């Protein structure tokens, strides 16, 4: 049975105007020009040092109309940074109070949203200006865990402006980073990380059976012979039905046999294979 989930943690932003495509092309890590109309991708907006202040799901309607989905907890600062130079272009950024629905499984044929964003073979996001006749039967945590399992990263206030896009594996996801388009904010750092091997970090998935929660921005522990030392940064953490799912940014050269655990816990974390390759 399909699950319909109200994605209340997200804010929808409509970007429109004669310069919308050109403006976003100079701001985001994706190639906005080459993104097909009706297509969606994760993308990031960086500061001048190449550190991400926001991760967006970008949806292109046309060269003059786009939608961005972003977590509400990073919205104020993230959006302010994105539209900082918009005053010089014919582009507007408007918050839309639309219904945002995550669907896992088949969509009902009777539901006809304004827009449908295909995330993968099993998941989609429906955007509608008014309320759709949907029976919500899934918790938002289910969607968050699905993101973790798919290796789709999350940025929170605790991790804003801390990581370059490759540290959260964006080079391996959808059309999140273009290394061939022109300049954008932070582009030099992102390119250097690829072509000079400057990036030494990657995001990994872990799970453990426990009732514990984990704090985003905190560390885990790694075993070194008879001792344990702190390592990594937790960027996503969701406990669903007694299973704690984590995304952790760590050094990208960790051994597959390395042992990890939560802070102040004797229970070992189980490393889950990423659904994509992070080899650049």
Curated annotation (Swiss-Prot):
One GO process term, biological-process aspect: iron-sulfur cluster assembly
Cystine residue pairs: none
Stored Pfam families: GCV_T, YgfZ_barrel
PANTHER family, A to Z: TRANSFERASE CAF17, MITOCHONDRIAL-RELATED
Family: To E.coli YgfZ (UP14) and B.aphidicola (subsp. Acyrthosiphon pisum) BU435.
Name the UniProt record assigns to this protein: Uncharacterized protein HI_0466
Organism this protein belongs to: Haemophilus influenzae (strain ATCC 51907 / DSM 11121 / KW20 / Rd)
